[in-house]
């Protein structure tokens, strides 16, 4: 009988930070710089907002206040979450053996079976976190209010009622979002037009050549459908593929105006892999992760939300 090696491991507090970071910050929107990350929010963080009017006045010998300064705040308060999984080691052994014996296409070998298990689960958490960032609803189990929910509840956000996006109408619909953008934002270096996958695909296809969109039958730069999917622009605005957005949604904002908060160094953080072999003789492994996460925006008036009808 083969010897069973125990893989029970616990990381708590700051020691769990690396794993929590991999799980949360690997989300597409975060990893590609689409949102400002506040990594050490223990409980909540106040986002101060300063607005001014008429800063400059004619010169004079006297000091005279020339401006109205408005200072208010938004609260970024990450919520606590946990992941509890019960896994059978045998379900993962084949994959692990293939990697460790060099029969896999993967180049990065986790240093142990325990690390392999953690990496598998972390990838799933990152996918879920990406969805939560955009479409999460705190009333739903395991979610926090995402950017779309927060924008929907903010009366100052610039709303655009949309439709189902296709390659034939995508340019016109993206144009509606850019047209609704406050003039002060246009030309800012971190302004991004965040789009759902189906919108991004439709835009790439439209660039491939449709008579109605003005790029010609051979498409943009006469490349037809051989269009690059990286570094796309629309009317001078960066187009950002936000995998967490539902189909037909678009969202325009400065990346410095939207925030993701978590407490990477929080004492509440925990990553635990518990091998049940020595406890009940089974081949099960229990995985536990505890962390905090949440999002918030700053100025709603500097955001455009495109919602399908």
Where does each model-flagged region fall?
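Sequence/fold signature of self-assembling virion shell proteins
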Residues: 2-57, 145-168, 204-309
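Short helix/loop capping segments that flank catalytic or ligand/cofactor-binding pockets
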Residues: 95-96, 130, 202-204
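Extracellular structured ligand-interaction cores
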Residues: 80-82, 188-190, 284
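Alpha-helical scaffold segments that mediate packing/assembly in large oligomeric complexes
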Residues: 98-180, 307-309
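Short coil/turn segments at secondary-structure boundaries
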Residues: 133-138, 187-196, 216
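Short, flexible loop/turn elements at secondary-structure junctions
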Residues: 89, 151, 197-199, 291
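Long, hydrophobic/aromatic-enriched structural stretches that serve as scaffold segments
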Residues: 56-116
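Ordered core of a single globular domain
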Residues: 172-210
């Amino acid at each position: 009988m083969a010897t069973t090696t125990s893989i029970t491991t616990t990381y708590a507090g700051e020691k769990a930070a690396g794993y929590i970071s991999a799980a949360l910050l690997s989300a597409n929107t975060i990893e590609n710089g689409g949102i400002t990350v506040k990594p050490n929010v223990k409980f909540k963080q106040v986002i101060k907002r300063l607005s001014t009017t008429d800063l400059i006045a004619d010169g004079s010998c006297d000091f005279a206040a020339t401006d109205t300064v408005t200072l208010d705040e938004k609260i970024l308060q990450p919520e606590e979450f946990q992941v509890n999984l019960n896994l059978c080691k045998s379900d993962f052994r084949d994959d692990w053996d293939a990697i460790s014996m060099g029969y896999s296409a993967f180049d990065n070998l986790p240093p142990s079976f325990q690390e392999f298990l953690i990496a598998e689960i972390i990838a799933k958490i990152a996918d879920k976190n990406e969805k939560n960032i955009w479409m999460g609803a705190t009333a739903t189990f395991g979610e926090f209010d995402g950017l779309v929910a927060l924008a929907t509840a903010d009366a100052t956000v610039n709303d655009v009622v949309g439709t189902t996006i296709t390659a034939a109408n995508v340019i016109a619909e993206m144009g509606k979002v850019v047209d609704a953008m406050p003039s002060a934002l246009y030309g800012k270096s971190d302004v991004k037009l965040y789009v759902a996958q189906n919108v991004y695909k439709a835009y790439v296809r439209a660039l491939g050549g449709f008579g109605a969109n003005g790029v010609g039958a051979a498409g943009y730069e006469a490349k037809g459908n051989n269009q690059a999917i990286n570094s796309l622009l629309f009317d001078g605005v960066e187009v950002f593929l936000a995998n967490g957005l539902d189909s037909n949604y678009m969202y325009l904002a400065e990346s410095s105006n939207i925030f993701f908060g978590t407490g990477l160094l929080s004492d509440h953080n925990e990553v635990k892999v518990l091998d049940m072999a020595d406890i009940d003789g089974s081949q099960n492994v229990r995985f536990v992760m505890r962390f905090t996460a949440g999002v918030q925006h700053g100025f709603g008036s500097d955001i455009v939300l495109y919602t399908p009808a």
